[in-house]
Design a protein with these regions (language model features):
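Buried hydrophobic-core signal for structured, non-transmembrane domains
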Residues: 48-54, 91, 104-109
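Long, low-complexity ectodomains and other extracytoplasmic segments of secretory-pathway proteins
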Residues: 23-45, 49-51, 55, 113-142
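Extracellular/lumenal ectodomain signal focusing on beta-strand-rich modules
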Residues: 32, 39, 62-64, 105
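Bacterial N-terminal signal peptides that target proteins for export
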Residues: 1-12
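Short structured motifs
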Residues: 31-37, 72-77, 89-92
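Short, surface-exposed loop/turn segments at beta-strand-coil junctions that are enriched for proline
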Residues: 94-100
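Surface-exposed binding patches on compact interaction domains or structured appendages
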Residues: 57-88
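Bacterial N-terminal signal peptides
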Residues: 10-20
């Protein structure tokens, strides 16, 4: 009889511990998931602030932030977020030497067990300064 009580107790203890581990974890959410800068004048620098929030019940750790190319700098405001806390992710794109449609991806590595690497993207159309000036002059004639 004691053996059955031990088995039942062990089962409930395992279930409780497992449920605690599953439901107590960080959960990272980023907003917006994508952004379009529209037209960007060549050789200019543009910036967008994305926001990452911890919707989980444990501390979210931002382990690393990086971009798909050296033309983009990414900086996290904080590296540790308590539950329901958020921070800015500043993304700066340098269009120097670029031309045409640009598609870039930013990666955030976290301790979120269900979403350890968050990917979000931005786009833009880099136009040459002369073409931009021409567009402005043509627009003012209308």
């Amino acid at each position: 009889m004691n053996s059955n009580k031990t088995k039942i107790f062990s089962f409930f203890l395992f279930t409780f511990v497992f449920a605690s581990l599953v439901f107590t974890q960080p959960k990272a959410v980023i907003h917006p998931m994508e952004y379009d800068f529209g037209d960007i004048v060549q050789d200019s620098i543009v910036t967008k602030i994305f926001v990452i929030k911890n919707l989980g019940t444990e501390m979210l750790k931002i382990i690393e932030v990086k971009a798909s190319c050296g033309c983009t700098a990414v900086v996290a405001g904080k590296n540790e977020l308590m539950p329901n806390e958020s921070t800015d992710i500043k993304v700066t794109f340098n269009s120097e030497g670029k031309s045409g449609k640009q598609n870039k991806t930013v990666y955030i590595e976290t301790n979120d067990p269900k979403n350890s690497t968050i990917k979000f993207a931005f786009t833009g159309n880099v136009i040459k300064k002369d073409d931009f000036i021409k567009q402005i002059k043509e627009g003012s004639k209308k």
